[in-house]
Amino acid sequence: MAIELSEQEQLRRQSLTALRNLGIEPYPAARYEVTATAREIADNYDDAKKNFQDVRIAGRIMSRRIMGSASFFELQDHTGRIQVYIRRDDICPEGDPTLYNTVFKKLLDIGDFIGVEGFAFHTNTGELSVHCRKFTVLSKSIRPLPVVKEKDGKTFDAFTDPEVRYRQRYLDLIVNPQVKETFVRRARIMATMREFFNERGYIEVETPILQPIPGGASARPFITHHNSLDIDLYLRIATELYLKKLIVGGFDGVYEFGKNFRNEGMDRTHNPEFTCMEIYVAYKDYLWMMEFTEQMLERVAMAVNGTTELTIDGKPISFKAPFRRLTMTDTIREKTGYDITGRSEEELREACKQLNVEVDETFGKGKLIDAIFGQYCEEELIQPTFITDYPREMSPLCKRHRSNPDLTERFELFVNGKELCNAYSELNDPIDQLERFQEQLRLSEKGDDEAMFIDMDFVRALEYGMPTCSGMGIGIDRLTMFMTDQSSIQDVLFFPQMRPEKKVVNDPAEAYTAIGVPEEWVPVIQKMGYLTVESLRKLAPGKFFNDLCGFNKKNKLGLKAPSIDEVKGWCDAN
């Protein structure tokens, strides 16, 4: 009793065999030369010019209307869909109707890839179509696609379950074509940024992902082991220190688009693996970098959306430069009435208590201030806003402020209540840098597992001399969320990190036979999706009886049907 596959899966495998029996290879090795796309035909076809009279298109069959000796189907390629008109007499000129009557009508299915040779025309109803002279099977789909129906502008049976969409992104891209546009725009964001940097003579570089010391940010790293060297290594949490070593080495400006990894929480705006762009430019400071960042984001918005005026989470947000600038101290004072200037760790801890900000004993001054800011200020920063001049304890890699040594020359850009980028006038004093690293070590000893490691090679590089330099890092995933108005980071990642799929444990056959289910019916019931005896108790006996009989008949199982009373007994069993 073979019922491991659904009826559709069985039929498609039978079609696969039938194609081969007819001498048609369902997965041919030869290339198929495509001469036009659906969009090119839609954008450029002209009845008067009679262009596209000899085209070869290829794609996936997405719908069919079979009408005797002539039919229509929709072909979807990477640019969109186009209707194809196919007629038996055109593709079966020798009088043998097999190619149309058997192959097209019976052995091809929605989801199959085919190539079509023909010419473009408008049907009597004005629908742009390709008249098929010849088709070639390119790939047989043996698993049916979800069928999304549209009628009168309404969508039915849409493929919208986020859990399934993220796990099976390939399927999401097939049946939800608007999803592809998000990723096309993501690529445009990165291309525009590269163009912006390259025009200014900055060099794109690559730095190690496996690092002996995870530096450049305060975060918990992933740890791995190199068997040959017998050493632990870390997946990088930032590219910063290696890029600054290149500035030491004489590059005037370098940037990198790279994957970073942080072994921390997952939510709608955080994924443990994420894409970040970092850029470092010699002889610049954080004031210059603010203007540079404004110009870059203004250009990205125009390239991706054609305007700097966007809507994010229903709120109008403008990326037109210049952006607002506020100091962190003033922002906290404005929102809480508390002045963090010159406060000790004990005073800040007491302030957190008074302000009902949750902290723990491992927090130093920097994290205490960050906790206050995060709870009271971030969500209020809707329009693009530079928060500047952070307390020194929050920024171990940043240069002291030129007019206040308790502050640093740092800014973060906030948009829609979220941090988008982080930038410094980079610390280039090797003695000061070592002292900052040592302070991070003290925080680590207190239990702060996000404190920075001491990187003595980086200190050594600074000892050779690094020019005045400004650096900026920006999260590409979050930028894409803003530019495409997506509320979840999973919607801008092709394959976001997911928790393991929950595996439902089937009840043993004995549990079913104990309530009267015949042994031969147990695998059938479980194949129908009722994996536990408990699941039967939630069913309406009459409907379940009809479903059982229908499944038995459809799959030609030949089992003796139970009576309605027997089925009622299974559902009512305690």
Where are these regions (language model features)?
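Class II aminoacyl-tRNA synthetase catalytic cores and aaRS-like
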Residues: 1-504
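Compact, charge-rich alpha-helical regulatory domains located at protein termini
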Residues: 501-574
